[in-house]
């Protein structure tokens, strides 16, 4: 009811900040359809911003995919810039063509705390993300029985653009943090030049549908010490 965009506040998901015996707090995330058991990267950044507003000053927490920590880099004009440590990525699976979808789909599968399929395309701005994303999410036999979020990626000079169809929301969202991480790791593995590279770390700037985010990681064993950075702002109470 809270997530309903007609009769509630309107949101892609609901997060609960709960007490933890091990860390500063625990984050429980639920999609707008009530499903849970996965990590939400942008939700994690928003949870840290919320925790800070509640007076919490240290941000080690537990989520569905394990331990996370975060830093607030800036807090200006009601917008917090949050840097969140994400799960390491130990495996990437490449597919020349998924079986089942009506459109042939070459891409990569990764788990960044949530299951993601990444597909590189041209003309992303006008791409039918919902139709093709839904087709892959429900019909790709390789991703069954659980399915996966589907990310469409287009490199540009200086970074990548990402649009995501999210399962559980069953629509395109303005930005998906775990999907953006998956897209950046896939971009590196596919030879897409990063925005910067220094001391063994690579960094990608990412244009989502609304915000500019960044992902940096060490490209060892696919991706280690992965961090997601972006804005989080208060909307309603």
Spans of model-derived segments:
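Short strand-coil-strand connectors
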Residues: 64-66, 87, 99-104, 209-211
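C-terminal domain-closing interface element
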Residues: 90-93, 97-112, 117, 223-237
């Amino acid at each position: 009811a809270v997530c309903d965009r007609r009769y509630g506040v309107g949101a892609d998901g609901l997060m609960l900040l709960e007490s933890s015996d091990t860390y500063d707090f625990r984050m429980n995330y639920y999609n707008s359809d009530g499903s849970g058991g996965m990590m939400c990267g942008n939700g994690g950044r928003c949870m840290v911003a919320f925790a800070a507003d509640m007076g919490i000053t240290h941000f080690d927490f537990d989520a569905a995919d394990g331990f996370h920590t975060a830093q607030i880099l800036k807090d200006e004009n009601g917008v917090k810039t949050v840097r969140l440590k994400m799960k390491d990525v130990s495996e990437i699976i490449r597919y020349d063509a998924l079986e089942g979808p009506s459109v042939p789909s070459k891409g990569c599968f990764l788990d960044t705390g949530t299951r993601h399929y990444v597909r590189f395309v041209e003309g992303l701005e006008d791409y039918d993300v919902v139709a093709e994303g839904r087709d892959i999410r429900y019909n790709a036999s390789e991703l069954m029985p659980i399915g996966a979020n589907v990310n469409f990626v287009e490199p540009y000079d200086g970074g990548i653009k990402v649009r995501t169809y999210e399962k559980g929301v069953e629509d395109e969202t303005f930005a998906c943090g775990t999907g953006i991480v998956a897209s950046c790791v896939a971009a590196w593995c596919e030879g897409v030049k990063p925005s910067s590279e220094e001391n063994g770390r690579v960094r990608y700037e990412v244009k989502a549908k609304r915000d500019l985010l960044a992902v940096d990681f060490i490209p060892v064993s696919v991706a280690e010490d992965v961090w997601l950075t972006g804005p989080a702002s208060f909307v309603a109470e």
